[in-house]
Amino acid sequence: MDQSFGNLGGGGGAGGSGKAAASSFLQLPLSTAAAATAYYGTPLALHQAAAAAGPSQYHGHGHPHHGGGHHHSKHGGAGGGEISAAEAESIKAKIMAHPQYSALLAAYLDCQKVGAPPEVLERLTATAAKLDARPPGRHDARDPELDQFMEAYCNMLAKYREELTRPIDEAMEFLKRVESQLDTIAGGAHGGGAGSARLLLADGKSECVGSSEDDMDPSGRENEPPEIDPRAEDKELKFQLLKKYSGYLSSLRQEFSKKKKKGKLPKEARQKLLHWWELHYKWPYPSETEKIALAESTGLDQKQINNWFINQRKRHWKPSEDMPFVMMEGFHPQNAAALYMDGPFMADGMYRLGS
């Protein structure tokens, strides 16, 4: 029975120092399930931890509900040496005789059952049955601190089981949602989702009602409907989807084939734009007339021209602070809004850099 409970607790192995085991074993998390994880991953039997920790460990050492170490002198203090085998057996007997010992074992086995394969579940269930069949131990004297210790450890294991169960429950819920969505998609073709084959079979039987004598075999019984090929449902679903969405898919395919890659203009058009850029580098803001001329010479539309100049100015052009300004003869209000959004000046045409 002790071997089946050997993975409960935290701390080091049996060969670890009593002081180190005491520190890791006693500080039981009462409200945070996250801290419980740190205890679960490193195996140590409950009676081994208690033996290594010493009797003082469940008598107020480090517990949030007790003052700092006023019980240490009861059993020789926290800084004493390792306890004897007799004292360890005494602590073990007290824990095993406690009324909550069976609840502690049950909480531990519940943690082990989470996500376990069927054969392990069967073994754990048998172990739990054996433990339930044991007569309860005799708890002679009331020990409030041991009661608190047992209750805290049961709470810790219960919270840890919740942490273990949560991701499994979430995964099962996700799978159910996916299954429901797949059933909905399949139901669009057959109207029955996962049970579409059964519905098709039922439809076949209903069509036989009131049919002619050709549907009867020589014995007078109705002919059995033919067995449905499992792959026939998938083929039918594929056919229905293609029939319904083939036009839309065809238009998408044509659109993707015609669509040019983003930012990749024809080489000849880019060369003409770069040539204009080099000639007007001091003020690379083409007027509407120049944009129309560039569109005619490059074969691009106005949007492509505008986007190219915007990107080119952002990446490769920065106006000089001491660059002279010259008042232009004319003002082009049609360019003002574009420059206000793109350039460092308030209006295109109001000021233009001198050549």
UniProtKB/Swiss-Prot annotation:
The keyword DNA-binding applies. Residues 218-233 have a biased composition (Basic and acidic residues). One of its GO terms (molecular function) is DNA binding. Keywords: DNA-binding, Homeobox, Nucleus. It holds the Pfam family Homeobox_KN. Transmembrane segments: none annotated. Residues 236-256 form the ELK domain. Residues 52-82, 207-233 are annotated as: Disordered. GO terms for cellular component: nucleus. Expressed in stems, rachis and inflorescence. Residues 60-75 have a biased composition (Basic residues). Residues 257-320 bind DNA. Its main location: nucleus. It is found in: Nucleus. InterPro entries: ELK_dom, HD, Homeobox_CS, Homeodomain-like_sf, KN_HD, KNOX1, KNOX2, TALE_homeobox. The keyword DNA-binding applies. It comes from the Eukaryota. Probable transcription factor that may be involved in shoot formation during embryogenesis. Belongs to the TALE/KNOX homeobox family. This is Homeobox protein knotted-1-like 12. It comes from Oryza sativa subsp. japonica (Rice). The lineage of its organism: Eukaryota, Viridiplantae, Streptophyta, Embryophyta, Tracheophyta. The gene is OSH15.
